[in-house]
Structures are given as structure tokens and as C-alpha cells.
């Protein structure tokens, strides 16, 4: 199996990224698909596209996906109230949740901010954040999401990240899309992947925050988030 990673930017600013884990025979097809995706992104046409193909060394872990729950909300106020409610139920203080919203509303990070329950940033590079890599979803899960109207192509990408991070012991995740016109975001916990409509305003940037328990070994967690190969099924 091979990992294929795509990253696209313009004037040094991140536009889009995607990743797949595939058999050798599918490399050419997937590289073409990811290139097309980079060139046709709503955030603009990139002046730099990087595609990296690597043979996976070591065992791939297969992880069951989080249950997918969609919560329709009329506006950002209602959506954020619901997100806060879900996160408080996981034991996260409200002031820390509001701090997380401030981080994602600033945008600009390629990865996720790591925030403990004291409000301390744990990611080593505050500009970059921590990127969850070496992930994909099974074809059967992708087809189920798209054919049963459980979500969109963006849901397919997001469920991979959310399921991996929760499996590895992250307490919860809060995310809004860096696609400026896509306003549905999500909260992920061990109880599920909660798609919440109108979690940000159209045109606003997006971001991602992982809430971390204070007793976690951060170095070990980051290493697994970035390097442990996982396929979500």
C-alpha cells in the first residue's frame, strides 16, 4: 500500500490538501484525481502543488468510523450553542471552548491546535499546528456516506481525521472548513461525529482544535497523529 499526499498553495498560503492510501495499481489514477482537485478548488488556483507518494512501511490499522449525526441549525448563534453544549458534556470548560473558537476563527493554520483543559497550547509550532496524516476511508464507507446522504465529499475527508484522533485518545475535536463558502463544521467526541450546519459564516476562514487531557504524553500523541497509518471503515 502507498500513501499519496497532496498540498496546494498560492503565494505561500495554503489552499487545499488531501490524502489517500491505495494499492500500487491505483497510484496513477489517484494522483490525477488529486491534481484535478487542487486545480479546481474554490479557494483559488494554486501556483504550487506538491504530491508525495510513499510506500507504507509497517502495519495499517483499520478503525471503525464514528457514528455520523447531522444537526441542522438556522444560524451561527444556534450552531455554536449546540457545539458548546456537546463539548461541555465531555467535561470541557466553556471558557476553553470559547478560546478554541477564537483560534479557528483566526484561520491560517495548516494543522490543528492542541489545547488542554487549562487553556494551554501544546502544539510545538503555533503557526503550523499538528497535521493528521497517513489516513484514508474504505470505499464501502465512502459509498455509504455519499449514497445514503450522510454527508458530502468533505464529510468523507473529515470522518477520517475525526475517527483517527478520537481513537488515539483526543478528548474532542472542533472544526470548521478552510473552504470559505462551506459553512458546515463539526464536533467529534467518542459519542460521534456531529455535523453542525452554519457553524461559521460564509467567507470566514476555518480551523481545527483538538482538546487534550492534561495527562497525555504529547510527543507520543503527535507522532501517532502524524505517522500512524489508518484506514477508517
Curated annotation (Swiss-Prot):
GO molecular function: 6-carboxyhexanoate-CoA ligase activity; ATP binding; magnesium ion binding
Key word Ligase present: yes
EC number(s) given by UniProt: 6.2.1.14
GO terms of biological process kind: biotin biosynthetic process
Biological pathway: Metabolic intermediate metabolism; pimeloyl-CoA biosynthesis; pimeloyl-CoA from pimelate: step 1/1
Catalysis performed (reactions): heptanedioate + ATP + CoA = 6-carboxyhexanoyl-CoA + AMP + diphosphate
Residues annotated as transmembrane: none
Needed co-factor(s): Mg(2+)
Record's keyword annotation contains Nucleotide-binding: yes
This protein's UniProt keywords: ATP-binding, Biotin biosynthesis, Ligase, Magnesium, Nucleotide-binding
Assembly and interaction partners: Homodimer.
Family assignment from sequence similarity: Belongs to the BioW family.
Family matches, as NCBIfam families: bioW, PRK01322.1
Function, as annotated: Catalyzes the transformation of pimelate into pimeloyl-CoA with concomitant hydrolysis of ATP to AMP.
The protein's name: 6-carboxyhexanoate--CoA ligase
Species, as recorded: Methanocaldococcus vulcanius (strain ATCC 700851 / DSM 12094 / M7) (Methanococcus vulcanius)
Lineage, highest ranks first: Archaea, Methanobacteriati, Methanobacteriota, Methanomada group, Methanococci
